[in-house]
């Protein structure tokens, strides 16, 4: 058996073993409600507290996945600071790792928690790393098993089919993402002047599917692809559904409920 055959065989065997273990821990995919909580920007303490409530656990295990920020130390510090006032068990899983210092697989780590928060940063790089490492597949397993997923900016955009990103030089462009949530997404809708006009242009021209736009500090809770609740931590922050009707772009605003 050559090295490639050995690695493939080993990975397949480990995947089957871990799959059976984690299914017992979280229940079958058919029984779980799939949950995603997003924010246009600012996934801070109130959003983390709301995610903790969505898990249904008294002291849930919440994991921070800072791939998009290149495992930024300052982001990790902020994560622990934002979790401090809440009754949660916080942890971090870096993506820039080595086998010499990490003995647990992606499945063992990501499928053992109750919620996963993805950082902001470069969405394009995030998607490339996830696919190279197989993290995208594990996140889908987590979603199917009822582990609450979430994040803001790149951490909200990543769950949709596509959206607008500043991940490339010079200007905002389109990025293709995981596609757990149908349609497109625009974060930072009120915070960056080019976000709204570009989103309207792309949807109006048919280059991008209709979708959800979120101001900073505003967000949406989805169950099984359906928006269940609109929330915010700042009074002026709103959520919008942007679509094409009769050949023109229509922006429908929603007034979120405050969370604290």
Language-model features: locations:
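General beta-strand structural signal in soluble alpha/beta enzymes
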Residues: 38, 92-93, 117-118, 149-152, ...
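N-terminal export signals
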Residues: 5-25
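N-terminal secretory signal peptides
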Residues: 1-2
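Portal/gating segments that form or line small-molecule/metal binding sites
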Residues: 69-125
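Short, flexible loop segments at the rims of nucleotide/cofactor-binding pockets, characterized by
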Residues: 40-42, 92-97, 125-129, 189-190
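Class I SAM-dependent methyltransferase SAM-binding "motif I" and its flanking Rossmann-like core
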Residues: 119-196
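C-terminal and late-domain segments of enzyme folds
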Residues: 28-59, 69, 73-85, 115, ...
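Short internal beta-strands
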Residues: 63-67
